[in-house]
Amino acid sequence: MNTIKIAGVPEHFNLPWHLAIESGDFEKENIDLQWTDVPEGTGKMCQLLRDGETDIAVILTEGIVKDITAGNPSKIIQVYVESPLIWGIHVAANSKYNTLTDLKGTTAAISRLGSGSQLMAYVNADNQSRLHSGWKTDDLQFEIVNTIDGAVQALKNGTADYFMWERFMTKPLVDQGIFRRIGDCPTPWPCFVIAVRKEVLEKQADVISKILSIINQTTVDFKNIPSIDTTLALKYHQKIEDIQEWLSLTHWSQNQLKAEMLNKIQNQLIQLKIIDKKGTFEDLVETV
């Protein structure tokens, strides 16, 4: 049995992995795929890849691109979710802030340095700077909160003013009157990719190829699974109508990241001063 460790966020995007593991699809191919939930998100998963504590990460595109250019010994082997991630911009329910304009000069709660929540705060500030003078990405301030529970506390205590997280996963907190959503910020690129440590690719490329084949078949069929909306709503504590909207907006991919898209992502990260140099397509991407 080939043991492979994989990490991802405990969110609805990753249910196809759990279904494939539970149904024994990997086991039939002599693969023991060991899943670890990482609620801290992309910054933490980058560290797990660097430390050799996971072999594969299902990870935010912008985060892993940034970290590979900074020396993470991993490669992107495929896009996992083609559609953008819709980041909700949230404040405490009783906050004095009502519009995105009000957030200029305030503090963003982020899970970790280098996380999607930090990188997208730069994207949002850049978007706002085009609409309103006075917004500058250099003025952004951050409070590290690790998880969504940490963000709840930070916004409640006033140590941070707003928090960006996937809109639908955060919706229950809005429904409960804990957060109030004042805007959205979709990623300008496919949201999730599959990244693998180079050492694993060199030694077990055939196993990684089998894993891709299995998950791709699962995601192709995923939306056609009977009552999948009910399954998702129950598992992730969502309203059925929210899950149905999310399903209509979400498109899984079975294709490799294209060079033009990688170039677009890196150009924007350079413009935002998140990276200072671009990697080549070969530096970042490998097809198995």
Residue ranges and their predicted role:
Residues 2-138, 142, 161-167, 180-186:
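Short, glycine-/small- and polar/acidic-enriched structural segments
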Residues 25, 66, 124, 172, ...:
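Residues within well-ordered alpha helices
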Residues 138, 147-232:
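Pocket-lining segment of extracytoplasmic ligand-binding domains
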Residues 202-276:
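Secondary-structure end/capping motifs
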Residues 270-288:
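Conserved C-terminal helix/tail region of periplasmic/extracytoplasmic solute-binding proteins
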